[in-house]
Amino acid sequence: RQFSIMAVVWGVVGMLVGVIIASQLAWPELNFGIPWLTYGRLRPLHTNAVIFAFGGCALFATSYYVVQRTCHTVLFMPKLAAFTFWGWQLVILAAAISLPLGFTQGKEYAELEWPIDILIAVVWVSYAIVFFGTVGTRKIKHIYVANWFYGAFIIAVALLHIVNSAAIPAGMMKSY
């Protein structure tokens, strides 16, 4: 339920940032000369908010709901599931602060700096443990196809994140 609510919140925030940067294309002075409100700083924030904050929360919410219903059981390790919620919100908050400040790797859809990437990895591994643990403790024999797709998505995103976000740290908030 928490992920569903935050999906709506982050969706609205992401779309509002999109409206701001779209308006800046017509009226560049809308950044008011403030560096962290420029198009170049807000565009990565918009894409990350819509994809990872809105989309990520929606996928967490639906996968957690579906796996419980189709496996006829509660989530495996509920406290770890709660950690995935708060950890993911922390990732989003860290991105919302660091991107406008210009802390970025400059890689499309992998802009976040290495400390945030590590937090993403920890949250994602926790998510995999909760999801696959729930499938493993199911009360029915077969696994619904939706769970195969969610499982594939979890593995694919993990691989994509590891490969696309691989970086060499050059400082606390800088990597190459």
Question: Residue locations for each model-derived region?
Answer:
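Glycine- and acidic
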Residues: 1, 109-110
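Hydrophobic cores of alpha-helical transmembrane segments in multi-pass integral membrane proteins
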Residues: 2-103, 114-135, 147-172
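Inter-heme linker and motif-flanking segments adjacent to c-type heme-binding CXXCH motifs
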Residues: 103-109
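Inter-helical turn/loop segments and adjacent helix faces that build the functional surface
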Residues: 134-142
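Long, highly hydrophobic alpha-helical transmembrane signal-anchor segments
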Residues: 175-176
